[in-house]
Design a protein with these regions (language model features):
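Function-determining surface determinants
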Residues: 1-253
Length: 253
């Protein structure tokens, strides 16, 4: 048990260091990957926490991480859209969006949401150690394994549903994949599962981008020239996603 707790504490401290680095990069607007790296780090934290629900401090930390995720989602979406627009020659539309980013980066760095997350995260290793001392972590390893297996079962059921919802499938795939990365020694997935999950997530991500951009185009006039292409790309992505999901289901379940 002590080894597992040591690993948890080490991961939490590493994630805290990563977040502090991202915060400094955002505050100084050093590069355009800082926001993405911040979100990736928060995602890794949430994946680490999900199987630990019920332990002291976990709920508060999950809520704080979720708040940072909600704060930064529209900013990251704008980044991704601007990159697409630049790539396809719509430079003016891209620039209009990118001009907003530097100030947005600074606001995220100074936000109460990020400050609150860092405050709770700094104290969390002490919560884990105190829980261990009070014998609250008995059975932690099988509990984590049981919750990881339950996530895998949920994905299996969703894949077998003929009326599956792509949004929910995308979320379930991300949860399973990131949990496996957080607990590689505890998550007993089939040998080729990670590569299949990554491909499925990518295919659903392409579909989701088009779906989201088409929704934005309804009230952003400068996106209208892209609408026809997005409809075609979305239809193609749906077919690709279905094929990849069928392969995931056949190979891994």
């Amino acid at each position: 048990m002590s080894a597992l707790v040591d690993q948890l504490v080490a991961q939490v401290i590493g994630l805290e260091v990563g977040l502090l680095s991202c915060q400094a990069r955002l505050a100084a607007v050093t590069d355009d990957e800082a926001l993405h790296d911040l979100r990736t780090t928060v995602r890794r934290l949430r994946s680490l926490l999900r199987p630990l629900r019920g332990l002291p401090g976990v709920e508060q930390l999950e809520l704080a991480a979720s708040s940072v995720g909600q704060l930064t989602t529209p900013l990251r979406d704008r980044e991704v859209l601007a990159a697409y627009l630049h790539q396809h020659g719509y430079h003016e539309a891209a620039s209009r969006r990118l001009r907003l980013q530097p100030e947005a980066y600074r606001q995220v760095a100074q936000s109460p949401e990020l400050a609150h997350l860092l405050l709770i995260l700094d104290a969390f290793p002490r919560f884990i150690r105190a829980s261990e001392h009070q014998k609250l972590l008995k059975g932690l390893r099988p509990r984590i394994q049981k919750r990881l297996a339950k996530q895998w079962q949920k994905l299996d059921e969703a894949l077998k549903d003929p009326d599956h919802d792509r949004h929910r499938l995308r979320l379930l795939i991300k949860r399973v994949r990131y949990a496996a990365e957080a607990y590689p020694e505890l998550d007993k997935l089939p040998a080729n599962a990670m590569s299949r999950l990554k491909k499925a997530q990518g295919a659903l991500g392409d579909w989701h981008d088009c779906w989201q951009w088409l929704a934005q185009a309804e009230h952003q006039a400068d996106l209208q020239p892209c609408v026809a292409v997005w409809h075609r790309t979305m239809a193609k992505a749906e077919g690709q996603a279905d094929r990849v999901l069928d392969r995931l289901s056949a190979d891994c379940f």
